Structures are given as C-alpha cells and as structure tokens.
C-alpha cells in the first residue's frame, strides 16, 4: 500500500526508539479464511510481545496475511516516558539562540518578552494572544521536523540541498527553543503560566510558524524568504506581514499585459491576444520605493533586494517570486491583540467637521435607493418570506453564542449555556419570548464582543448581538442577497460564479484607453464616519418601502429591521480589560449583524459611485464595470483618448482627494493593467491567489476534534498548494499520523492506517493522492466502509434528554404548527432533526458523542466486525459500473494557455488540455422546479438530502408534502401530473450526485466537466432512455479520465457497454444512496 503506512512505521520506530518499544501491525480482510489468519496473527503478536520475544518469525509464518490482507492499524507499545524531544533537540541546537528586540512593537505586550515580565502572576496571565489554538503540540511539531531531517540526512544532489536549507533553518529554531526548554502543553494543548513564565511569551506560536515555513522551503529563494521571516518574526509580532505584503498593491500595476483571458458573452473565459502597456507615473514608483525603504528599516534585507531586482525589467516570468513573497508573508502567524486595543483602534480616528456634506448626502441617498431597489419587488408583492419573517428567522437560527451564559432547564436537566437556539427555546417556554421588541444595546446593556484575527492585519471586533437582531434581519437580508445574486456588481454573491469570472470581467475592458481604479475600504467600513450616513441610508430606504405595502406583517418586518438600525446607532460595548469590564460608547459599524456582508457591499458600491460621480465632473469617461467584493471595490473607466502617465497621476490624486473629503481612510490606486484586492490579484493578465492559510496556528478554538483538525490541516495544505505555496507532503502526513492516533493507556497507542484515513467513510481525513478523490471499490475497501458506517451514528444521552424535554418538544411543535398547513411527518421530523443537530455545538453533547465514537473506533481498529448494511454508498454505485468500462490509451494535446500561473504542474496540464469553468455546478437542488415551488409559498428550505428523498416518493405522497408546506392543492396536483416532475427527478439526482462527489471542491472546481475534449474520450452506446444512468456513467468516466491525467500526465479513453438489464437495477439503486459526512467533507465545507 501507499507511502503513508511506510512513513507511519518509520515514524513509530523514530519516536519510540527504546528497547522496550514494540509495534504490532493489525490486518483485516473481507475474505473470511484470510480474516481468521489475521486474527490468529494478531493474537500471537500480542502474546509474543508480552513475553518480550521478537515478532520476526511470526512475520515469516504469516506472510500470506502481510501480502494479501489490508493493514488496519498499528499498535505501538512503549514503557518510555516521553521526554525524547528534548534529548533529540539538543543535537540540532548547535547555533546561536535568537534574542528578541524588545522595542520592535508599539504595544508593549506585542514584544516577545519573557512571560513573567508581561504577566506578573498566574491570575493575570492569558494565553489568548499567543494560543496556537490547534490540537497538536509544539513537541509533536518538533518531532515531525526531526523525523523528516533524520529520514533525509543521506539525500544526494538537489534533495541534499533542500535538506541542508531546512537543517540550517531548523538549527535557528532548535537553538532558540533549547535555550529555554520545550514548553510542555496540558491535555487541552494549551500552554499554562507555570510552563511559560520563564520563556518568551510568543515562543510557541513563533516556533509553530517557523516550522511551517521551514518545511515549505525547497529552492534557495524559499530559503532566503523563510530565514528572514523566521528571524524577524521572533521580535516583530505586529507589522512584519503587513510590511512585506504592502508592495503587491503597486507591483500588479507594473507588468504589461501580453495576451490574457477575458469573459465572453456566454460567461466563459476565452483567450485574447491583446497587448496593454503598464503606464506608471513616477509618483507611484516613489510610493513603492518608500514601502521598500520601510521594509529595510524593519531589518529586512533579502526580500526588498528581490523586489528591487525584479523591478529592473518587471517580467511576468519572474513575478512568481513576487507572488511567493506575498504568500509567505502570511505564514508568520496571526496578529492577536488585546480586545481593548482592537476596539479603541476604530475609535481613535479623529472626527473632523471639515467634510464634504454634499458627498455624504449623495452617499446616503445611494444607499437608500439601493435598499429600495433590492426590496421593492418582494415588498410590493407582499412576499411570504417578509410576512413570515419571524418563522424564517427561527428556522435558520444559529447555535452561536447569544452573548451571556444562562441557566436553562430542559426537563429534569439543568444546563448552563450561551447558545442562541437554547435561549430561544427557554424564552418561549417561560413566556419571555418577544421578537417584536428589539433589546436596546445602549449603556445599560452593552454588547459583548467576539474577535477576528487575521495575519498581517489588526484584530477586529465582532458584535455578539441578542438573537432578536438576527430574527429581525434574517428575512430582509435574504431578499437583499437574492437581488445581489443576479446583479453582477456584487462579485461575491453573483449567481454561481467563481473568482475566475470576476477575473475575466476585469481583463475584458482593459485597453490603452482605460484605467482601473481599485480601493481597499476595510478601514472605512469600521470607521466612525461611516456609521451615521450608513444607518440613516438604510433607515430612509426602509421608510420608503413601508409606504409601498398595506400588509401589516410586511410593515412590521420592515419596522423591526429599522429598529435594529436605530438601536445600533447608539451602541455601547463591553470590553474585558484585565479584571474590569469597561463600557465604551462605540460609534462604528462592526461585524456580527446578519446584514454585515450585504450592507457593507451596498455601502461600498454607494461609495465608489459617489467617488466616480465626482471624478466625472472633471474627466469624460464611460464606466465599463463597477464591482464590489467584500472590503474592496474596483471600477474600469474608459476614456476617449489613450491613457498617459499624467492622466493616471491626475486621476489617482483626484480620487485620493475625493476620499479625503469624506475623511475616508482608504487605500485607492489607479492602474492600467492589474488590480490587487483581498481575495485575488491580477498581474500581467493572469490571476493569482494568496496562499496564506496558516497550518500550525489557528485563528480560534472551536469544537472540532483532533481528527477534524487533521482533515482541516490537510485541506489547508491542498488549498495552499493550488495557490502556489507548497509544504512538504511527508511533513503533512507525519502531522496526520500524530493527530489521528488514539491513546488506549499511557503506554499503548493505536495508529490508524492509510486505508482507514483515506476511504470515504465517516472517518476520512485525507486523499492518498493529492487532488484526486478516490472512491474505493475493492472488497476490502467496501468492507471497511460498511464497518465504519455502522458505528458512526453515536447517541448522546444529554442530547436525547434535552430533545425529550417539554421545552424542546414545544419549540419544535411551535415551528411545525406555524410552518405547516397540514401535518406532515417528513417536514416535522426534518425540523426536529435540524434542531437536535444544533445541540451538537453544545460542548457536553459533542464530547459525549465523541467519546462514544472513539471507543467504538478503538474496538474497530483492533478487530473489525463485518456488518451487513442495506445502505448504499456512492462507492457501491461506482463498483457496479466499473467492470463494464474498457480502457485504452488516448491523446489530448495542450490547447489552452495558462491563466493561473501558481497551479501545480499536473493540475495545470489538465486545465490546459480540457479547459476551465467559470461557474459552480449546482449541487443544492435549488434550481429544481419543486424547490422553486416550495419557496414560492413557504419559508421552509429543504436540504438536497430531503429533496432527494421526497422526489423518489410516490406521487400521492409528494402531493401531500407540497400541500402541507402551503402549496395550493391545484398547483401541487399540476406539478405531479406534469413532465416537469420527471425532469426534476433527474435534476435533483444530478445535484445530489455532484454534491456527493465534491465536484465544487479541491481542484475539481477548476475543470470544465462539459469540455468537448473530455467528451470525445468517452464512448457509451445509447440504450434505452434512462438519463440518470447515462449521467452517472458519463460522470464516472470523466472522473476516471481526469484522475488518471492528474496522476500520470497522460490521457486514456473509456468505452462502456452497459447491459440494458443492469440499467434498471442501477437506476433503482441510485435512489437509495446514503450521504457520508466525514472530517474530510467538513474540512472542504469549512474552506468555503
């Protein structure tokens, strides 16, 4: 089997290297004869090891097991106390330890002082500013590096260069840590005061980042970048990432476009051989020079030198180095500040009376008009979502914090919880539930705060508002978003598009007579000057809308929404500062409202329109596109003459002056060839993404387990790899080995094998081959998948107790009664299941389920029990199909040019042969008629799983289902009797299968699955009309071909002669596919 098991075995010998250590392999087989031998083999191994005998003779005797059975897990057994890390580390600590510059950062606590200098006592101490927030320890990370170094110490040629580079960097890390001793973590993977008091406060998070960086070093340039970042980030914990990545916003404006991709009328990318010259005024070069000087002032040498050298000819070929530096800068780790500083940062802005009130006025009116435009149609038509807004809000109520911990009673059980959903249930049960009253957030009841940490930026605060705010805003915001969905200005929400579409939009209109203006408005969004005009614009819009309807329910919805805006104009926040909780009047907009994203986009669109209308007073141009995307906005302006240096400089200065008239602290730039925004940047006509996801430090602690985090780690590694930042795969696998191991007792540990972690079961963590999702079809794979399915659904006593309490039942019944016109088991059960699932975020429930799962897993990893299941997985379907396919060699030539230079070669090759796609494949069922019919009459949104179940019911039952959701019997009858219904069956099945096959994740989201080049490699004779079967055969063939091409860099063609008799069987099976959720699929989802 694969490389993983080999690494696993070597890693165990490396870690448990004493005389007493034993490794016992555990095998399994789906063949009952061989399975008996497996069990015998295991028993004898355990026996021999107890007697201290060698296992070698057994390996000979049971060669049949080792050759033919599948490795299930490794049992490792060692008496040794585990201080091996320190012993091994000494051998690498040959260098000079780093000394922190204690004046490098403005805020005292951001300096890397000895912990006891920052915190006098254990009571004062907090780890929140340096907590790696990941369920793996520094000692494990050190072990993983030393294991890699030992394994590769005899490498030759180029591999030896990599070894030497990494060894050199690790010497810095090892020497520094060795000086203070390795900090020991507690059972929650946190570092306590006792451990940290005599060590530098940021030692752990710095070491994690450094290890992540040094294990991503391959070339000499990587080495120089990493060395500089590792050394400087030891002292500079505040501005380093920002300094290093700042120049990028200008660099993108310096490269000529010589051939690019543009979006055509069909929303596809097509190549255009246009040439656009980069026109750069001297002023811009001066600004860039200033940035480079700032880097040098901060002690950087090699990185500014690389940028300076690139500036000589600004070539696109060498730009990959610039994009590398930009990505690397994020890997210095998160900047975590104290809440008080994060909050005051936004309040420090000087308020000046000297602002252009006319512009503010225009800005407010634009916001008002946009709100009206977005909501006009639903309001005039008395849309049911706006009428039943409260119910809609309750159905999608999150289980996030409600800001305070309360004591709640569920039946006989008393619970302390902060969760919104639980508070709602409790309030309803005690008659305290008043959604018509929006609680005040003024000085008597200040808002508690959450935080958001990002590398290279300051910490931002998040409002944790009472659930009434969510209910009041939910329905209206949903309507705003569905408007934004078909409005191209809103790049983030535009229907099923992905970032490639936005890229083609920009390049499409670039030419010698256009310039593109791009602005980062993140400062503006959270500035005080924004809040009054912003909220007032929304309020004025809502007032106009209220006059467009006579429906009291719609008016009520709009009024409650308006009330949230009024309350938030006078908001106070509570900030813990040491032991006191400070109340501060906070006059700015913060995240945390349901409307945050939508409203910010509206405001940013209004802002750029205001700016453009001022510019239009002075210049004559046509605005070709305006886009807002999160905190950024950009516009392409077309002039009637060719653009000159002087023009670019004038427009640039005018734009900046206009922003300053509104006292908006934004970074506005003008270029003729490229843009840089938070999500992506375009340079030389190509698109780039920042590969800045931290692997060994996390932003915050959630309730994910080690297995989940191992899957997230792998998923982050894959995303970075696609974006051009590659970490050594062996290192990632070693981390997975560490994070998925399960302790049985102090000296006994169980390590799952590759088969367990890569089969798509409920325990899947990674793919055996990067970018390729395999669906095992061999006997052993299907066997293990069945086994795991049997133990995935663990019960939780606490959850059952809550769910059987009157409080919970009443709540679910209340929702069902409000929602349903007539009783319907499917829907009621659906609601109950959803509500019960929300309890999972309550820690005790989660832990209980997890414990049960781990103990079941432990049993299973030692001796799998065969399990007869009537559940069918996607693997079963593919297994039925596979035998009918015949493979032959084929040839596809490269015919598309590169547009995403950072892609790994094998993925790039596939795209160049079959092309890319600019849209998301619909995998939610929302495009089906039944889904549209339901949303026309009801606020209920069935999941793809539920639609898939419903659509395969008998027609009578489908009709009842629809009627119970408020669809008029006539419409329901018409639907079931029409052709649309049979089309829907196909549509929903298609969506469901796409969803199961993760077609919108990983690198599959980049490939054009409908490529004619791909189609011509597949030959399937047409027999009978079962479109669903044809669909699955084709999709299987496409995935097979693409996976083969990614792996081997060559093409195959497939012929399938599927017997007609089997088709009906397959079709029936296809209506019983069970969806599998695993840490792996959750991690994919988490990436979204």
From Swiss-Prot:
Domain RdRp catalytic span(s) in chain numbering: 501-687
Q: Which cofactor does it need?
A: Mg(2+)
Q: Where are the transmembrane segments?
A: none
What's the main place this protein lives? virion
Give the location in the cell.
Virion
Q: Which domain of life is it from?
A: Viruses
Extract the SUPFAM superfamilies matched here: DNA/RNA polymerases
Enzyme class, one word? transferase
Return one Gene Ontology term, BP aspect.
Answer: viral genome replication
What Pfam families is this protein classified in? RdRP_4, Rotavirus_VP1
What keywords are assigned to this protein? Magnesium, Nucleotide-binding, Nucleotidyltransferase, RNA-binding, RNA-directed RNA polymerase, Transferase, Viral RNA replication, Virion
EC number per UniProt: 2.7.7.48
Q: Name one GO cellular component term.
A: virion component
Subunit architecture: Interacts with VP3 (Potential). Interacts with VP2; this interaction activates VP1. Interacts with NSP5; this interaction is probably necessary for the formation of functional virus factories. Interacts with NSP2; this interaction is weak.
Q: What is this protein called?
A: RNA-directed RNA polymerase
List the top taxonomic levels of the source. Answer: Viruses, Riboviria, Orthornavirae, Duplornaviricota, Resentoviricetes
